[in-house]
């Protein structure tokens, strides 16, 4: 990957959360962009990675939504005097990345016990579900940003998306009174390029070759008796003189002047 594209991809993580579409809208837009490539069995880098994130987000999103629904339904059976587990006792996303998946439940259970050894079982399940759902949501946010990057690279081109992220970051980091009212859009950035490409497609005629061309004579000439004569002009009737003889005089000089000697 180009160094500028790599930097732009890293900057995607710093963009505001509300810049990106909601999960449902994002997946739908990504599928629309990927459908032509799926039909042609394309193996482009952006197609493969975007397809992976579409599948990942759909699975994670459904699982996370299920966790939230179960956790909410458990609230009715949790004793009303039970205090919620503080955030500091719940495993965070950064910690979960360092813990093997099979040990995640054990680590979270140990933290709940350290908070309150006799914590009610229903409240424990609720705490587990809330912790796992939070981890999934943060993973989904990262996957959502990456999916946005890859399917937009298919739609607009990697160079255009890189340019757009750079301009957007500059606009966001500029104090409000020194910047334009509206943030830059990728459509506005790519419109001049599309217009130029469209103009080239509709132009008629042959393309002029690069470099210098040999200068061509409009009228081809030849040399006759030391004089240059155009081939495009009418040729006179051949004169009866021999080759090398003097040229005939004009019609006005055909008759000799009378000789002074008779």
Swiss-Prot record:
Keyword annotations: Capsid protein, Cytoplasmic inwards viral transport, DNA-binding, Host cytoplasm, Host-virus interaction, Microtubular inwards viral transport, Phosphoprotein, RNA-binding, T=4 icosahedral capsid protein, Viral penetration into host nucleus, Virion, Virus entry into host cell
Coiled-coil regions, chain positions: none
Family, similarity comment: Belongs to the avihepadnavirus core antigen family.
Job of this protein: Self assembles to form an icosahedral capsid. Most capsid appear to be large particles with an icosahedral symmetry of T=4 and consist of 240 copies of capsid protein, though a fraction forms smaller T=3 particles consisting of 180 capsid proteins. Entering capsid are transported along microtubules to the nucleus. Phosphorylation of the capsid is thought to induce exposure of nuclear localization signal in the C-terminal portion of the capsid protein that allows binding to the nuclear pore complex via the importin (karyopherin-) alpha and beta.
Cellular-component GO terms for this entry: host cell; host cell cytoplasm; T=4 icosahedral viral capsid
Keyword Kinase appears in the UniProt entry: no
Protein name per UniProt: Capsid protein
Region spans: Disordered: 183-262
Biased composition (Basic residues): 215-234, 252-262
GO MF, one example: RNA binding
Gene3D superfamilies: Viral capsid, core domain supefamily, Hepatitis B virus
Assembly notes: Homodimerizes, then multimerizes.
Sequence motif: Bipartite nuclear localization signal, positions: 215-233
InterPro entries: Hepatitis_core, Viral_capsid_core_dom_sf_HBV
Pfam families from the UniProt entry: Hepatitis_core
Top-level taxon: Viruses
Biological source species: Duck hepatitis B virus (isolate Shanghai/DHBVQCA34)
Claim: Plastid is one of the keywords in the record: no
BP GO terms, sorted: microtubule-dependent intracellular transport of viral material towards nucleus; symbiont entry into host cell; viral penetration into host nucleus
């Amino acid at each position: 990957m180009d160094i500028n594209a790599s930097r732009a991809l890293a900057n995607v993580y710093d963009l505001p959360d509300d810049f990106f579409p909601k999960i449902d809208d994002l997946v739908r837009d990504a599928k629309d962009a990927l459908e032509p490539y799926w039909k042609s069995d394309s193996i482009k880098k952006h197609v493969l990675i975007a397809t992976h994130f579409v599948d990942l987000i759909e699975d994670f999103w459904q699982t996370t939504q299920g966790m939230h629904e179960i956790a909410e339904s458990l609230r009715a059976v949790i004793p009303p005097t039970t205090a919620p587990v503080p955030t500091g006792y719940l495993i965070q996303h950064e910690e979960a990345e360092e813990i093997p998946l099979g040990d995640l439940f054990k680590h979270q259970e140990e933290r709940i016990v350290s908070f309150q050894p006799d914590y009610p079982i229903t409240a424990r399940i609720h705490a587990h579900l809330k912790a796992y759902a939070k981890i999934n949501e943060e993973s989904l946010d990262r996957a959502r940003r990456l999916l946005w990057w890859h399917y937009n690279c298919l739609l607009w081109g990697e160079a255009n998306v890189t340019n757009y992220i750079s301009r957007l970051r500059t606009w966001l980091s500029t104090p409000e009174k020194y910047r334009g009212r509206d943030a830059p859009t990728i459509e506005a950035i790519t419109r001049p390029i599309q217009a130029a490409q469209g103009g080239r497609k509709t132009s008629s005629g042959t393309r002029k070759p690069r470099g210098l061309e040999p200068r061509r004579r409009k009228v081809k000439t030849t040399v006759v008796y030391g004089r240059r004569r155009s081939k495009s002009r009418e040729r006179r009737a051949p004169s009866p003189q021999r080759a090398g003889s003097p040229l005939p005089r004009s019609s006005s000089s055909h008759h000799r002047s009378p000789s002074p000697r008779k």
